[in-house]
From Swiss-Prot:
Keyword Cytoplasm part of the UniProt annotation: yes
Source organism: Salmonella arizonae (strain ATCC BAA-731 / CDC346-86 / RSK2980)
Keyword terms: Cytoplasm, Stress response
UniProt superkingdom: Bacteria
Homology family: Belongs to the GpW/Gp25 family. IraD subfamily.
Alphabetized InterPro entries for the sequence: Anti-adapt_IraD, IraD/Gp25-like
Gene Ontology MF terms in the entry: anti-sigma factor antagonist activity
Protein name: Anti-adapter protein IraD
Chain's role: Inhibits RpoS proteolysis by regulating RssB activity, thereby increasing the stability of the sigma stress factor RpoS during oxidative stress. Its effect on RpoS stability is due to its interaction with RssB, which probably blocks the interaction of RssB with RpoS, and the consequent delivery of the RssB-RpoS complex to the ClpXP protein degradation pathway.
Record localization: Cytoplasm
Length: 126
């Protein structure tokens, strides 16, 4: 006969494993970066519009286009991760084959910012 057990939430399981808030948010953001935004996202509920804005085909030589992409990216991240209070997104390198981004996020109740250098390489964000 099996003894009843109390189910453990995934968040509690992660906390037991010693994974801190920065690592949790970093993992969540990497999942977001490697998903695509749905077409017509403005007319869909927020849960269905998550995903990265597409950057292929953009004129990366135009600073206005890169600024637009950073704003879209920032909006997608803030919709996806409520623990981020302040977020700065900038293009680190757009003039070579892989697109490189820099993100700096201030998390709720965390004194140190989360800093990420993310590069698009071989079809994935790393």
């Amino acid at each position: 006969m099996m003894t009843p057990t109390i189910p453990v939430s995934p968040l509690d399981r992660l906390l037991v494993e010693g994974i801190g808030p920065h690592e949790l948010v970093r993992r969540k953001l990497m999942c977001l970066f490697n998903s695509c935004a749905s077409a017509g996202g403005e007319t869909l509920p927020p849960l269905l519009t998550r995903g990265m804005p597409e950057w292929h085909g953009l004129n990366v030589g135009d600073k206005r286009v890169l600024n637009w992409f950073c704003r879209e990216l920032r909006a997608a991240i803030l919709r996806y991760e409520p623990r981020i209070n302040v977020l700065r997104v900038s293009v680190k390198d757009a003039y070579h084959q892989p697109l490189a981004l820099y993100l700096e996020a201030i998390l709720q109740d965390e004194p140190e910012p989360l800093r990420l250098d993310i590069t698009y390489y071989n079809g994935r964000w790393r």
